[in-house]
Amino acid sequence: MKIGETAPDFEAETTQGKVRFHDWIGDSWAILFSHPKDFTPVCTTELGYMAKIKPEFEKRNVKIMGLSVDSTGDHEGWAKDIEETQGHAPNYPIVGDADFKISKLYGMLPADVEGDPKKRTPADNATVRNVYVVGPDKKIKLILVYPMTTGRNFDEVLRVIDSLQLTSKHQVATPVNWKPGQEVIIAGSVSDEEAKRRYPQGWKAPKPYLRIVPQPQ
């Protein structure tokens, strides 16, 4: 799968009931993030933090869905540990992909994987540690793949969503380390003539291809 392709649709059992992914997204943005195995340390911190900052995603009209090859029953049992140690229990649906169907569909596991998921170790599922950001058009906007030893930075995911939502509305790009409210770059596809109409106040241009303007509102 690549950025710009349609996110594969699926129907699955989650901790909040059965869902069809595209219908569940509706007109919102969405994050599908997977983890190698329940009852593991790094994942415990990740799912707890995601629950803590869920309101920030909701402000941006972003829905959250987790996934692993464990059962929904295991997810529910693990949620108690997450709340106890992290202060927040998962407050978003988590897919029970015990038949590996979705992990295979998204290319996180080889097509020939089979067997009892309970017998698989976290190392067996090391490739099931991804983040997908999906737009209202059901297209994949971002793919992040992390190693098992490195917890994900969900604040960075928020920053990227801010950039994606801004640049989907305005013909701009965001520069290195950009944060909301900072200057942006006029997209290269916008001619100087069109830029003058859009930005009558002008822009800074240390080079002709680098046209800097305040963030559009």
Language-model features, listed with the residues they occupy:
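Chalcogenol-based redox active-site neighborhoods
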Residues: 1-217
